[in-house]
């Protein structure tokens, strides 16, 4: 069933999400140059730490990391084909970047269908079903970037809801570009195909874990549940990154809590290979604490201007291999 309400009716106007410009190639994204006009002076960049002196670190294609787990353990409900695909890469599954403190999980190449069918409640015209091919492995952060991690690199904290373990928010695309560059070479936004691939974790339902949202395990506006799902609390703020249960691939809060900036292809057709024009819009994925359930679907996407920032807008780091 098509969504009968517009965006302004289904998420709070003051907290709406954005659009920007980015360059991409394959599933690897080259961050665009931020506009000087819109760039905020958030950063007092901290010098990179001398992590190369730590001999306990492991080299992953030129990226020095500490290995947390070589393969997923029984605490992650990962299907056997995914486990086999990760093992075949001969790369550590769970690693920590010593400079930022951010934990990353390995995603192997694979295929997935993104978007939603026309009869999915909340479906929009820009959610056409597309069969996609993830050509290269990549690492994606286990959670959205926290304020503690942001301050470690950037110094200043722009967030409205303040707490070291809470996701950093109220950040624009330009702010996030500056942050990724300060983290070092190779860090970037995830492509929206990569994001949805990791969010769905092999599922084809509106949400990675079910056909409905449970407000006890997803932070969204529980007064507006999905279809005939049960209502729940409206927490009115973010919760700590990693505090909600992970999906079957180990990623936390892919639904709700905070919208996540991602890079989009220039057209829906270009999404099939995660490839597209050098001038593309940046989208937000996942929904937030302020949104109705249908805005938190795996397929849901919103675009805004690159200087847009709100207390519902954050991001999750990625790194190519």
List each language-model region with its residue ranges:
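Functional-site microenvironments in short loops/helix caps that host divalent-cation chemistry
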Residues: 113, 117-121, 159-162, 167-302, ...
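Compositionally biased, intrinsically disordered low-complexity segments enriched
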Residues: 2-14
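A short glycine-rich, aromatic-capped structural motif
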Residues: 93-159, 171-174, 256, 263, ...
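Residues embedded in well-ordered beta-strands
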Residues: 105, 139, 206, 260, ...
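N-terminal pre-domain segments of enzymes
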Residues: 26, 41-89, 93
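Short, structured beta-strand segments at or near domain termini in extracellular proteins/domains
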Residues: 311-321
């Amino acid at each position: 069933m098509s969504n009968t309400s517009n965006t302004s009716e289904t998420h709070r106007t003051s907290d709406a999400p954005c659009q920007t410009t980015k360059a991409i190639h394959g599933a690897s994204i080259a961050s665009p140059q931020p506009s000087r006009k819109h760039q905020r002076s958030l950063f007092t960049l901290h010098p990179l730490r001398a992590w190369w002196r730590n001999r306990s670190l492991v080299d992953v294609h030129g990226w020095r990391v500490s290995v947390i787990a070589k393969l997923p353990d029984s605490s992650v409900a990962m299907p056997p084909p995914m486990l086999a695909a990760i093992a075949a890469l001969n790369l550590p599954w769970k690693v920590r970047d010593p400079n930022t403190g951010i934990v990353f999980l390995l995603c192997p190449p694979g295929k997935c269908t993104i978007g939603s069918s026309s009869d999915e409640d909340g479906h929009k015209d820009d959610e056409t079903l597309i069969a996609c091919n993830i050509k290269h492995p990549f690492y994606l952060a286990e959670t959205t970037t926290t304020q503690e991690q942001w301050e470690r690199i950037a110094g200043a904290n722009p967030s409205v809801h303040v707490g070291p373990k809470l996701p950093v928010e109220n950040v624009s695309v330009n702010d996030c570009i500056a942050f990724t560059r300060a983290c070092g070479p190779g860090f970037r936004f995830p492509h929206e195909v990569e994001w949805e691939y990791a969010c769905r974790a092999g599922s084809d339902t509106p949400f990675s874990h079910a056909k409905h949202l449970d407000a006890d395990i997803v932070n969204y506006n529980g007064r507006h549940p999905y279809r005939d799902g049960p209502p729940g609390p409206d927490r009115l703020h973010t919760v700590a990154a990693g505090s909600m249960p992970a999906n079957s691939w180990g990623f936390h809060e892919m639904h709700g809590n905070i919208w996540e900036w991602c890079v989009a292809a220039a057209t829906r057709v270009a999404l099939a290979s995660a490839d597209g024009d050098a001038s593309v819009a940046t989208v937000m994925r996942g929904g937030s604490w302020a949104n109705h359930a249908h805005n938190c679907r795996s397929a849901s996407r919103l675009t805004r201007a690159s200087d847009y920032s709100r207390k519902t807008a954050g991001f999750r780091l990625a790194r190519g291999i």
